[in-house]
């Protein structure tokens, strides 16, 4: 008998994976902030706020937002490689799913390719656009416990 993973198990796995991804990212940001002298920049502003008309303030602002943009790109690429890499591996699961004995398959129960896992990852963005989390809630109410991104990618999340 096939045991589909429902909404709550999948939510816990998602939270675990979010923690696994976020902690190193936060540590990296803090290290970069402290070692590049970026924290000292804010101490040099009167009242801790930059002067909007000052050229140095503008340059710092551009550099700051450029760094944020680079970090955002790296975060997306890192998350994509994390999810698609683990879900297409012999584990068939991210570490968060593995802890809960969950795994990702195609509709026949076979492991997924890196391409399908990539499609599933980016289909989650579509799922996130649906108001009230309905795209995710589908995992609790559909027969095969599929969220919208699972339907788009033709995948299942099963329990061992």
Show the residue positions of the predicted features:
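Membrane-helix interface segments in multi-pass membrane proteins
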Residues: 25-76
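Hydrophobic alpha-helical transmembrane segments in multi-pass membrane proteins
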Residues: 18-30, 71, 75, 79, ...
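Short, acidic, Ser/Thr-enriched surface-loop or helix-capping motifs
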Residues: 106-108
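FKBP-type peptidyl-prolyl cis-trans isomerase
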Residues: 101-104
């Amino acid at each position: 008998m096939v045991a589909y993973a429902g909404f709550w198990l999948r939510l816990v796995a998602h939270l675990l994976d979010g923690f696994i991804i976020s902690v190193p990212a936060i540590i990296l940001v803090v290290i970069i902030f402290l070692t590049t002298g970026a924290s000292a920049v804010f101490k040099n502003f009167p009242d801790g706020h930059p002067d909007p008309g000052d050229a140095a303030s503008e340059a710092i602002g551009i550099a700051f937002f450029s760094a944020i943009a680079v970090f955002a790109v790296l975060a997306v690429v890192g998350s994509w490689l994390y999810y698609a890499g683990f879900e297409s591996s012999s584990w068939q699961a991210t570490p968060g799913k593995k802890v809960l004995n969950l795994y990702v398959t195609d509709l026949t129960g076979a492991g997924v390719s890196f391409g399908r896992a990539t499609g599933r990852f980016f289909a989650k963005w579509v799922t996130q656009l649906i108001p009230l989390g309905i795209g995710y809630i589908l995992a609790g109410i559909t027969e095969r416990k599929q969220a919208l991104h699972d339907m788009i990618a033709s995948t299942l999340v099963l329990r061992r």
